């Protein structure tokens, strides 16, 4: 544009290389509005955007991938808190993905200040890190329960491979998982702990993903400064890794990527990714009487074959 704002519309890797309506809409929207800024915390062994192995998040920044965040309306960056005095206010979503080490007291103070000011946040943990994670979220009313969730329904699966259900209440209140619920999708959490919630910290807690009575993902929200603060916490970090977003299992309709996109849509107040879905048509069923079947049968068995035969003879 004349004001210097630029937007890129890319061709992508794979068989379907051309941009679709969603990517075209995103590119146009970025010319008239700011992209959402999503920042990943580093410095404590968190899942890295630059890992392309198990647990890595590289697919989120691979520019030639259709589903990369940059192609869905996001500016992506990392943040190391060492030497900082404040977390920047222009961050739309701060992601803390399964840290391996505790934040220092000064870093924890910066995070607590960011939360107190109404910053939006995604936090993911892992089994075995409950004590560390509970220290991180101590002011949110969230608890990472001891142990690991196991399943015994599918003998061919790993015991810690959990297929969770979208919570209807959460989908209704936040929209996260609503599209999956409507199309009867589930999500896979390969190694997760359960979450607890205490409402005494000023947040409303809404379950997003559940399994056998346990909450695996929880949304927190509260009104602060005239705007709703939104925080999402999950007991697993693998579900949105490069491998996790592509997980498939026979006889189960999994859609981790869909959950990830709907989560970001919620966290950015419906700005990005762009939602180009349409309402399902209401007039999609036609009912026939018994009397109608006769002429339909005659049409397909008699008239149409005769027309085809006549056309073939005429063509010769």
Identify the residue ranges that each predicted region occupies.
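Hydrophobic targeting/anchoring helices
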Residues: 1-63, 68, 273-277, 285-302, ...
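Acidic, S/T/G-rich, low-cysteine, solvent-exposed domains in lumenal/extracellular/periplasmic regions
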Residues: 49, 54-272
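A glycine-rich phosphate-binding loop feature that marks nucleotide/adenosyl-phosphate handling sites
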Residues: 153, 280-282
